[in-house]
Amino acid sequence: MELLLLSNSTLPGKAWLEHALPLIANQLNGRRSAVFIPFAGVTQTWDEYTDKTAEVLAPLGVNVTGIHRVADPLAAIEKAEIIIVGGGNTFQLLKESRERGLLAPMADRVKRGALYIGWSAGANLACPTIRTTNDMPIVDPNGFDALDLFPLQINPHFTNALPEGHKGETREQRIRELLVVAPELTVIGLPEGNWIQVSNGQAVLGGPNTTWVFKAGEEAVALEAGHRF
């Protein structure tokens, strides 16, 4: 399988998706036809989200079609060489994808050679479940099971920092809560600017920041760019 799972879409001082464009270009391998899944968009319309994505990827020769615009979404997924899943609210993304019957077809198409690109919520959707999203559950997705393309759970935008005087849980504390009730899981705390690239059966960590791996009953382990999962 070919996956590009990004923690986030924007870095300080850079345009939207700018840091990801070289990664995307490197993994295209001649692919040009893409379907975009915009359902995580809440404060922007799906048309706006699709158009923005199409504009950014056009210089790479990628032709982007919003899945909500086609008459036959299943046929569009089957024909797609690239499946792009944008960030936003993970619960809405999963709900809309499930209700349209897109989860199994997307997973099957990626397993048969389509490139999967997802950032933030889109990275969450590639995991076994969305249980490590940071998002507010604004809708009920009728279950947390997702695409299960990547075997570990990703927590995008990972940071353990708290604002001064803040008394809420750290991100690690929230992840530890999950591991109490689901000790079989492994969670990757993927900070902004980092990504996981899967190609030719190898999953490789990239980015400038330290990534953390959490397992039940174990200390967190720090990983740097180049680590192979």
UniProtKB/Swiss-Prot annotation:
Lyase as UniProt keyword: no
Gene3D superfamilies: 3.40.50.880
Localisation per UniProt entry: Cytoplasm
List of catalytic residues: 120, 135, 157
Predominant subcellular localization, coarse grouping: cytoplasm
Record keywords: Cytoplasm, Dipeptidase, Hydrolase, Protease, Serine protease
E.C. number(s) listed in UniProt: 3.4.13.21
Effect of residue 137 to S: In pepE1; deficient
Cellular-component GO terms for this entry: cytoplasm
A Pfam family the protein falls into: Peptidase_S51
GO MF annotation terms: dipeptidase activity; serine-type peptidase activity
Catalytic reaction equation(s): Dipeptidase E catalyzes the hydrolysis of dipeptides Asp-|-Xaa. It does not act on peptides with N-terminal Glu, Asn or Gln, nor does it cleave isoaspartyl peptides
GO BP term, example: proteolysis
Enzyme class: hydrolase
Family annotation (InterPro entries): Class_I_gatase-like (IPR029062), Peptidase_S51 (IPR005320), Peptidase_S51_dipeptidase-E (IPR023172)
Family listed: Belongs to the peptidase S51 family.
Function, as annotated: Hydrolyzes dipeptides containing N-terminal aspartate residues. May play a role in allowing the cell to use peptide aspartate to spare carbon otherwise required for the synthesis of the aspartate family of amino acids.
Alphabetized PANTHER family for the sequence: ALPHA-ASPARTYL DIPEPTIDASE (PTHR20842:SF0), PROTEASE S51 ALPHA-ASPARTYL DIPEPTIDASE (PTHR20842)
Protein name from the UniProt record: Peptidase E
Protein source organism: Salmonella typhimurium (strain LT2 / SGSC1412 / ATCC 700720)
Name of the gene this protein is made from: pepE
